[in-house]
């Protein structure tokens, strides 16, 4: 029997949620009730699979903690009042910390004036953010298209490249093994994990995947395309593969890819959705090699952990394909005033506080210590690697990685695996993480590995 709509039920549910939003604290009974509600609603109305995925943060069989609020720039508090050091960073969105006061203030001030744009009048913050990004980004990047997520920024980049190269008879994209560019149909065509791709096959035609970091394979793909008349329109890659397991290419790889693109007349699209905004010790990871892309994709941390926003920034030559008809690719909420306010404030904080340099310094210290732990526990840890505050610990197998995440959770440190490489646990904290909290994270990691070693020896 079909369920009939219920306005009364919807009204009661929304009123209950609004009451929760107004609360700053919960008593014990309210906490227990909220936990039960959230788990039940995820199971019945969101996706029960998410509950099983969160096995690593299971406490007492309840599938996981229910977050309540930010504890500080670098911590989260759950409904039970437990405070966690955030070493996951929302998969890289909290570069300037949780509820950074500068970002929150900018959004609140804009909210008091005009939350969303009219679509007809010119909105000043979109113009100012585009100008700011033109000044901030490397090379000749000049024009920005704004959207709401990293996947959308990649979609826009692919469409820009197609619109630019199709009249030139170039239709094929090169992506790389281990890549993650999102899960919408176009972005998924560039993503390289079969688990995400196979249910939606066939994907968009015209994508080739070559081994990441192998410039000879990239060169061969260009040469074969030239010989067969299937010339390459663009290369899309991450300077460091995030979801692939924080995979760093050999030094000079990006430079050589840039040379191939120039030689064969292809565009270079860099997906810095996760590596951008200071994460790796530079504002953009491509700056480590002084490489200048034709199209740059940003999102995640661009909104300061307060508002969702993505950006696709391109050179004037490439972006000009949209000049005659700016409605070829648009989005209703992209570049809205609240999101732009958050992005402008985020950039201001990153520059004023020199957070990219802090990421480099603290990241080097953390990584050295993680590598020492890897040497101490070679039967558990394969390798520790990373750049800046984008780090990973790769374990010997998936189960060992899951166990580490669970042990860290017990010690109130949030970590998680990477989407394309489950045995690799990412360490991706806010760039604002204090020295004291860095030391606590290292202490927790050492305790976690020691506990895991005892379990291994007891078997």
UniProtKB/Swiss-Prot annotation:
One of its GO terms (biological process) is putrescine catabolic process. The keyword Transferase applies. Coiled coil: none annotated. CDD domains: OAT_like. The keyword Transcription does not apply. It holds the Pfam family Aminotran_3. Pyridoxal 5'-phosphate binds at residues 150-151, 274, 332. Belongs to the class-III pyridoxal-phosphate-dependent aminotransferase family. Putrescine aminotransferase subfamily. Catalyzes the aminotransferase reaction from putrescine to 2-oxoglutarate, leading to glutamate and 4-aminobutanal, which spontaneously cyclizes to form 1-pyrroline. This is the first step in one of two pathways for putrescine degradation, where putrescine is converted into 4-aminobutanoate (gamma-aminobutyrate or GABA) via 4-aminobutanal. Also functions as a cadaverine transaminase in a a L-lysine degradation pathway to succinate that proceeds via cadaverine, glutarate and L-2-hydroxyglutarate. This is Putrescine aminotransferase. It comes from Salmonella paratyphi A (strain AKU_12601). The lineage of its organism: Bacteria, Pseudomonadati, Pseudomonadota, Gammaproteobacteria, Enterobacterales.
